[in-house]
């Protein structure tokens, strides 16, 4: 498995050359870029064709892969116009992924709206249909739609159901290391259900509040070869924190066998 840095908080102030240089020097194989938040990396749908080509060239020259883009697109809207806005923006981000060499795009569910008279089954069907529409555009462009286990769509049964309803091979799950998955100190039961669909992982602080050693063992046993992206709070000394993080990550990988 490989380690990436997600620029949700940590590293959001680094421009792209700095981000790629720091990630490579510290030992991160990839970066996952959060879009639509005016982060310093500047990789957004507003980039021109020439600017997108330059981003791809910079990443290739650095040896650090842009392993994905991370969006705020979600498909639970009660109003059709809002839903269509998110779908259309997803499609624009799919083009951006393909142009900069990012193989995947993170999206959400994100909430149920039973208080508005919409059943969970109805929302799951709506989300699945949106994923299907986006995935059919993404597949020929070599982009995977990565559905994060997030918000009301965790517990696992909801996100798995959505992926099954979407019925598209390039729709997958992002396992999000959520404390809600821990049952009796273990995530084994949840992992058993989601493992066939997981092709990306979001890590957080590698502390004992979540059974990370077990997660790394389960990933190893599953033959997981993908990225584990570190989604970390900001720090006044990010380089120092990331060096410690890389060292701890390597320890967990080594202990997993």
Which residues fall in each region the model found?
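Histidine-acidic metal/acid-base catalytic patches
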Residues: 1-4, 12-29, 53, 60-62, ...
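Active-site acidic/histidine proton-transfer and metal-coordination neighborhood
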Residues: 21-24, 53-65, 75-173, 180-184, ...
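Glycine-rich, positively charged N-terminal anion/phosphate-binding segment
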Residues: 42-58
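A short beta-strand-loop structural module common to alpha/beta enzyme folds
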Residues: 29-40
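Conserved beta-strand positions in the central sheet of alpha/beta enzyme cores
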Residues: 32, 68-70, 106, 146, ...
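Flexible loop residues that form catalytic
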Residues: 36, 74, 110, 206, ...
């Amino acid at each position: 498995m490989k380690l990436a840095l997600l620029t949700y908080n940590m590293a959001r102030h680094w421009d792209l050359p700095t981000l790629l240089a720091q990630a490579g020097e510290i030992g991160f194989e990839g970066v996952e870029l959060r879009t639509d938040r005016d982060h310093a990396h500047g990789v957004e749908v507003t980039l021109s064709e020439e600017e997108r080509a330059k981003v791809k060239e910079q990443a290739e020259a650095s040896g650090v892969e842009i392993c994905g883009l991370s969006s705020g697109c979600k498909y639970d809207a009660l109003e059709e116009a809002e839903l269509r806005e998110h779908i259309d923006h997803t499609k624009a981000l799919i083009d951006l992924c393909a142009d900069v060499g990012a193989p995947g795009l993170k999206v959400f569910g994100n909430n149920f709206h039973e208080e508005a008279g919409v059943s969970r089954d109805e929302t799951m069907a709506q989300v699945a249909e949106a994923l299907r529409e986006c995935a059919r555009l993404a597949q020929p462009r070599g982009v995977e739609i990565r559905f994060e286990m997030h918000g009301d769509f965790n517990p696992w049964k909801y996100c798995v159901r959505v992926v099954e309803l979407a019925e598209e091979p390039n729709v997958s799950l992002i396992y999000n290391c959520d404390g809600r998955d821990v049952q009796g100190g273990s995530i084994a039961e949840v992992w058993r259900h989601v493992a066939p669909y997981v092709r990306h992982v979001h890590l957080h602080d590698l502390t004992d509040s979540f059974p990370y050693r077990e997660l790394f063992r389960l990933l190893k046993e599953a033959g997981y070869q993908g990225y584990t992206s570190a989604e970390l709070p900001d720090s006044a000394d990010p380089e120092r924190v990331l060096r410690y993080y890389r060292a701890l990550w390597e320890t967990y990988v080594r202990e997993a066998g």
